[in-house]
């Protein structure tokens, strides 16, 4: 959605690049694990017909896409066959083999590798600091190892640790 891309890469400076994804009405996330029924999918697809308000492209992120019901997949398939020009669908899943072949054949696939313990720790530290929280380095490394390469898991474990231990007491000994 960058308004001024350089060599195919986002500029990082325009209004679209600086948009807070969590507050954009043109970027919609659906958790398919809790919204797996056909009626929920149809409601989302009806909204896809409308042009984006602020961005060039409306983005629909369907998380845990492998959890969609058969009828929800069929509804999605019709739209994937002839998607509106102003819409991009991102199907995120940890189980691509569980998606129907008819859906997969209409998707461009990107596989993401697990992050290193160092990258997990650094990214989690950045997120925690932006939220005003701190965890000792040893505890953070313990959390990163437990996350097994998954950023979402690392943030979830860190959140649980902060809830259990409290900000100042998040030490490796308490976590173990």
Language-model region placement:
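Extended, largely alpha-helical regulatory/partner-binding modules appended to the mid-to-C-terminal parts
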Residues: 15, 19-25, 56, 92, ...
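P-loop/Walker A NTP-binding region and its immediately flanking N-terminal helices
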Residues: 1-109
């Amino acid at each position: 959605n960058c308004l001024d891309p350089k060599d195919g890469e986002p500029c990082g400076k325009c209004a679209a690049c600086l948009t807070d994804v969590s507050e954009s009405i043109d970027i919609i996330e659906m958790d398919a694990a809790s919204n797996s029924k056909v009626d929920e999918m149809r409601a989302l697809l009806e909204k896809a017909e409308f042009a984006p308000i602020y961005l060039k492209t409306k983005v629909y992120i369907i998380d845990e896409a492998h959890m969609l019901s058969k009828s929800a997949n069929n509804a999605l398939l019709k739209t994937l066959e002839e998607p509106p020009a102003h819409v991009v669908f991102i199907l995120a899943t940890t189980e691509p083999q569980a998606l129907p072949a008819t859906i997969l054949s209409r998707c461009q696939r990107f596989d993401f590798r697990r992050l290193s313990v160092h990258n997990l720790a650094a990214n989690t530290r950045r997120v925690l600091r932006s939220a005003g929280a701190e965890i000792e380095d040893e505890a953070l490394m313990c959390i990163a190892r437990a996350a097994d390469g998954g950023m979402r898991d690392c943030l979830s474990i860190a959140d649980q640790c902060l809830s259990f231990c409290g900000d100042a007491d998040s030490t490796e000994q308490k976590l173990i």
